Regions:
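Conserved ABC ATPase "signature" region
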Residues: 104, 119-142
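The feature captures the beta-strand-to-loop junction immediately N-terminal to the Walker
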Residues: 40-42
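Helix-to-loop junction immediately C-terminal to a conserved catalytic motif
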Residues: 55
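Conserved ABC transporter NBD signature motif
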Residues: 63-71, 80
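Catalytic Walker B motif of ABC-type/P-loop ATPase nucleotide-binding domains
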Residues: 171-175, 180
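A short, proline-enriched helix->beta-strand linker immediately N-terminal to the Walker B motif
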Residues: 165-169
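ABC ATPase nucleotide-binding domains
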Residues: 236, 240-272
Length: 272
């Protein structure tokens, strides 16, 4: 799929406080342009909060998000939407729209009206963007289905297509494999990896993160505790500290990435 040049995205001393609670605490993180960074950490670590902040949906209490040298939160919503696509855990499309129109909603920042009749009146570029996104997400057979009839996994893939038609330089994914079976998990992440877009994905599955992410960033209690190549970060001590589990980390015999073998839970309060 043809995509814009990968964007440069970074968080600088990012803090988010909501209702007296600190959800992010001085997080500084540069995301590798054109590569996939996995956001890891237990529930409540701050992964979704960080994604929403770098998407421009949650304004930081301090610090800033920089996109290609500009303060992200100083951009208009339309300009942000042309450069950053955010795929949330659950789509909030309540109307009984056909899948084709759900995907077309992703072109709203460019067309400024809804629904967008790409299949009849749009120019060649619009049709090409739509066709490439549909192919990349493997949803061509779903185009005439109604959104409410889709399974959770089918909705995830339609959401990806809707994000891709935005032609983003940054793709933000919040637990994108949650509702997918194993085959579609691998296919989904493989498709994303082949895009060459600056991608940040919150994931719970450490094996998937090790296999598909170029870098990983680990959060705990709203703080960044590790960031770097998966082979450097996904170590037994780090996993024990963050998740409270005993693991053995080996090299995968086929792709030379970390392979994690689970040994059991660590007693609470145990130091690795």
């Amino acid at each position: 799929m043809t995509v814009p040049p990968p964007a440069e995205l970074r968080a600088e001393e990012l803090r988010v406080r909501i209702g007296g609670a600190t959800l992010l605490d001085a997080v500084s993180l540069a995301f590798a342009p054109g590569r996939i960074t996995g956001l890891l950490g237990p529930n409540g670590a701050g992964k979704t909060t960080l994604l929403r902040a770098v998407a421009g949906l949650t304004r930081p209490s301090a610090g800033r998000v920089v996109l290609d040298g500009e303060d992200l939160h100083a951009l208009t919503a339309r300009r942000r939407a042309r450069r950053v696509a955010f795929m949330e855990q659950q789509a909030d499309t309540r109307l009984s729209l056909p899948v084709r129109q759900v995907i077309e909603l992703g072109r709203t920042p460019y067309r400024g009206r809804w629904p967008v009749p790409m299949d009849s009146a749009a120019d060649a570029h619009e049709r090409s963007v739509f066709a490439e996104a549909v192919a990349a997400a493997d949803v061509g057979h779903l185009l005439d289905r109604a959104w409410p009839t889709l399974s959770g996994g089918e909705r995830q893939r339609v959401q990806l297509a809707r994000a891709l038609v935005q032609e983003p330089g940054v793709l933000l994914l919040d637990e994108p494999t949650n509702h997918l079976d194993l085959r579609h998990q691998l296919g989904f992440l493989g498709a994303v990896r082949g895009l060459g877009v600056t991608t940040v994905a919150a994931l719970h599955d450490l094996e998937l993160a090790a296999a598909y992410c170029d870098e990983v960033a680990v959060l705990l209690d709203g703080r960044l505790v590790a960031h770097g190549p998966s082979s450097d970060v996904l170590t037994s001590p780090t996993i024990a500290h963050v998740y409270g589990v005993d693991v053995t980390v080996e090299r995968h015999p086929r792709h030379d990435r970390p392979h994690i073998r689970w040994n059991g839970l660590l007693p609470e309060g145990t130091s690795p």
